[in-house]
A protein has these predicted regions:
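Contiguous beta-strand segments within globular domains
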Residues: 1-4, 110-136
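Extracellular ligand-binding interfaces
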Residues: 1-63, 85-87
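Noncatalytic modules at the cell exterior or secretory-pathway interfaces
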Residues: 62-72
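Extracellular carbohydrate recognition
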Residues: 64, 78-97, 667
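Internal, hydrophobic beta-strand segments that form the core of beta-sheet-rich folds
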Residues: 71-77, 187
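Glycan-recognition and catalytic cores of secretory/periplasmic carbohydrate-active enzymes
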Residues: 101-105, 110-111, 140, 144-166, ...
Length: 681
């Protein structure tokens, strides 16, 4: 169940060296390696250059029957500024080994001999829970907190329970609020020291900022890369627009203007949320302004923008040479301009006193871009961008939400009644997409793709679960005295009820389930294509139903899934974290503390209170597994696409393999976690 390779790397000048190791077998169906989506049978590892590396690949759940090949691959992807002309690898040994205790990859059960807790710590008023396997409890079930001097400061009794045929023991010390550094002890298990402090989340924010900085495009990043991608550009009306800037998308070199704009929004909000920590707030401001510059620069000024590029190579930064990328996508659709107008309006509201000139400019272009968006929307409605755009799955409901939020922000900025009118008009349309009375399964508060209520909104990779509530909370803030504010708050409250309905089915770790589904949704072939890229409808139709039936039966053809229904693209970070953001926003608006507590528990899941007892933030806490990061390399603060499921199951799966999509670092996931930490601050 382990492959071990001894490898020497000699790559001239290379700062990041990540070869790939592959297994290929001759097995049918689900036992085939690689699988049909090329998501299994691969792993990468960042090597130290000009040194020997013992490369270990644990594969306890990978089919090892009829293995035909072991492959070594290395992507030649252009030359970064420090790269030389040659790469060499020397293989000294290839071995297959058996481990005494294979690493856990699948399932809800706690890992025996491990404490599952929030390794970054807890804030005094937040829920404070940890879990262990029942066999790790002492006979009396007692657990303790000890301070830095070894003194016992708290004693509690664990509560045992069974969930989905798995045993758990929960250690709850939420009522302990004294600030300090502590260790949790139960039976023979002792945690690493962790803080209970008001600023317990700040270190995680610093770590995420480190990752975001290392994803910068068009900027030298020490130890990572030099100035990059100065020869990639968009063409429009005889103009060339350089597209180097903002942040790279993930483990590759792709760039998404919408993602950079949304990340900038999160950074702007975080800079305000963490204003009591001056150094942290200023660093957030610095990174936000980097993203804002790119958002402003992608405008051609006529409603068309440079929007995205898929790129998996370095370029030589010389315009006119053979490696130029002149195929940056351009578009003038409503969605991209709505997102960017929000970013610009947020900056215009936040910048006065810091940069008055830039504040004025942001306000000017925010109004222009909103006008472009509405003109396009009124003419064409929902338009499909390239399938590789992060907004490809955007529904009519999501467009309504973006319009409401943009108009609400612009009203706050300008006090022009036209924006208030647009925001209130589209708020009615947005609320018409919500399930506002008990559905056949008894659940309320979720949103459909449009007013017809035929198809629920679902995500399985990129996600914006929180956006309807974000729009309504912004509108409530902008127009608190409007008579319709009662209805807006009711809609937000209904979404809170939806979150509570999901939480009622949550595991002891507290992960919010992905959502509710109807069996007959699979008959909508057109929407299937929007939601499930690189997935064949006829092939996956029976798998859709199989996935539902591994969830919880709510009756009348309705099901609840812990994880999304998905096929090729799998990873739960964005779904879970945008649900958490929705819970936190609802809590802020309605002062409902239980919803904030649910949001807090999602952040704690990423900090180690999950079935793998592992931090899902690279370099933070214990057992944070190496991410898939071919170009940026291992970077503290990286958050991956997320925990997946195996086949049609509804159990968490976190393989030891380092490959896409689930293990790939992703700006979306990092920004979503930062957003949650900002909202619960």
């Amino acid at each position: 169940d382990r492959v071990r390779v001894r490898l020497y790397t000699a790559c001239q000048g290379s700062r990041i060296v990540e070869p790939t190791l592959c297994l290929v077998n001759d097995e049918p169906g689900d036992r085939a390696v690689p699988d049909k989506f090329n998501r299994t049978g691969f792993t990468t590892c960042e090597m130290k250059n000009f040194a020997w590396t013992d490369w270990l690949w644990d594969i306890p759940e990978l089919s090892r029957a009829n293995v035909q090949e072991i492959e070594f691959r290395f992507r030649i992807s252009g030359k970064e500024v420090s790269d030389g002309d040659t790469v060499n690898f020397y293989i000294a040994e290839i071995a297959v080994e058996r481990t005494e205790e294979p690493e856990k990859e699948t399932g809800w059960a706690p890992r025996p001999g491990r404490l599952h807790y929030a390794q970054a710590g807890y804030r005094p008023g937040d829920p404070k829970l940890a879990l262990v396997a029942p066999e790790d409890l002492p006979e009396d079930g007692a657990f303790t907190l000890t301070d830095e001097n070894g003194n016992v400061v708290y004693t509690g009794e664990a509560k045992s329970m069974t969930w989905k045929e798995n045993g758990f023991a929960t250690l709850d010390f939420s009522d302990f609020t004294a600030q300090g550094r502590y260790r949790l002890q139960v039976g023979l298990l002792t945690s690493k020291p962790f803080p209970i402090a008001e600023d317990a989340n700040h270190e995680t924010v610093w770590q995420i900022l480190n990752f975001i900085y290392c994803e910068r495009c068009g900027c030298p990043v020490p130890g990572k890369h030099g100035l990059c991608h100065m020869d990639i550009y968009a063409r429009h009306n005889g103009l060339l627009l350089p597209f180097g800037g903002g942040w790279h998308d993930a483990g590759d070199m792709s760039q998404q203007a919408a993602q950079t704009a949304e990340t900038t929004q999160v950074l702007l909000q975080a800079a305000l949320s963490f204003s009591n920590d001056t150094m942290l707030s200023e660093r957030l401001w610095e990174e936000a302004l980097w993203g804002l510059e790119f958002t402003l620069r992608t405008r051609f000024g006529d409603g068309v923008r440079a929007s995205s590029l898929g790129l998996i190579r370095w370029t030589d930064n010389k315009i006119g040479s053979a490696d130029d990328a002149d195929n940056v996508r351009t578009q003038g659709q409503a969605m991209i301009n709505l997102i960017d107008s929000q970013t610009e309006a947020m900056a215009a509201l936040a910048l006065p006193g810091r940069d008055d000139g830039l504040a004025w400019k942001c306000g000017q272009v925010a109004e222009e871009d909103f006008a472009f968006a509405m003109e396009r929307w009124e003419k064409y409605g929902v338009e499909l961008p390239s399938k590789w755009e992060h907004t490809y799955n955007a529904s009519r409901c999501l467009h309504y939400a973006e319009i409401v939020r943009a108009a609400a922000l612009l009203y706050q900025l300008t006090k022009k009644e036209g924006y208030a009118k647009t925001a209130t008009e589209y708020a009615d349309k947005l609320m018409a997409c919500q399930q506002d009375e008990p559905s056949p399964c008894g659940v309320v508060g979720f949103f459909y793709r449009d007013e017809s209520h035929k198809r629920l909104i679902h995500y399985n990779h990129q996600a914006r679960e929180h956006l309807p509530v974000l729009a309504l909370t912004e509108l409530i803030k902008a127009l608190p005295g409007n008579p319709a504010c009662v209805e807006w708050k009711r809609s937000v409250k209904l979404f809170g009820e939806y979150i509570r309905s999901l939480a009622a089915y949550a595991s002891p770790y507290g992960m919010l389930p992905a959502g509710v589904y109807q069996e007959n949704e699979i008959e909508d072939r057109e929407t299937f294509a929007l939601e499930h890229l690189q997935s064949d409808y006829e092939t996956e139709k029976p798998n859709y139903l199989a996935e539902l039936r591994n969830g919880d039966d709510l009756g009348n053809g309705w099901w609840l899934r812990q994880f999304p229904v998905w096929f090729s693209f799998r990873g739960n970070s964005a779904i879970q974290l945008t649900l958490a953001a929705g819970a936190a926003l609802t809590s802020q608006t309605l002062k409902e503390k239980d919803l904030k507590a649910l949001a807090v528990r999602q952040a704690q899941w990423f900090g180690g209170c999950n079935p793998f007892a592992a931090s899902l933030i690279y370099g933070a806490g214990q057992d944070s597994s190496e991410p898939y990061a071919i170009f940026p390399g291992k970077t503290v603060g990286a958050v991956a696409v997320g925990i997946q499921t195996k086949g049609n199951s509804d159990e968490p799966n976190w393989p030891n393999s380092v490959c896409a999509t689930y293990k790939e670092v992703w700006m979306t996931a990092a920004a979503d976690l930062l957003q949650v930490l900002s909202l619960i601050e």
